[in-house]
């Protein structure tokens, strides 16, 4: 009996995707790597894809994969672009993008309890209705919560609030054997799921800390004659006493090519094209 048929016999209501043309969508991410390279070196098309609707369904998938020794690839919005969600030896892709409920916004505790596939943009919209905002979020605000926990942690507002792991109050995971656990930063296993790309299991839920929505926020563009001058300024700025009186959320470096591309996308010369911004 084929693996897909074995799984189908115990899957119950779990949605299964196994048509070749649909599976092909899961053989790449947002990154632009020529398919002839990946397909020559790896088996990038999954054996099949599942879209679980509950933690119990995820547990069933992982227990089956563990028993059959089949690779499992958790997948969110696939916006990272470095191949972390691309299969290399076929296996089962667990698509968590539909697993996206915002379970609760707690105004008193200033927290958001969300499912793994919740989009950062959706959380921010819902939280702002209660006067709260995300502390940090990735450059792709349409990526998923578990996706950023599993792959990164530094981005917008990190200069002020630090790594994403500092803003996770707790998270629920399902281990490779199919066991669910709720972990806090005090647990040793907590760090196993930060920036490890799903190697130790699947993040299914997280409780995130929020902040009061600021009254105002301003962006500033500073132009420099070259990158050395810009980096020297940043070094002086972050080490100066004045920074204690300024609420800086993020510092970004942009080069002339980036500004040129931005102007091209906007079909107008909106920004001055400087060697360093």
Model-assigned labels for residue ranges:
Residues 14-21, 71, 135-138, 237-262:
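Flexible, glycine/charged-enriched surface loops at secondary-structure junctions
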Residues 48-53, 218-223, 277:
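Short, well-ordered beta-strand elements within core beta-sheets of diverse protein domains
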Residues 101-239, 243-247, 251:
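FAD-binding subdomain of flavoenzyme oxidoreductases
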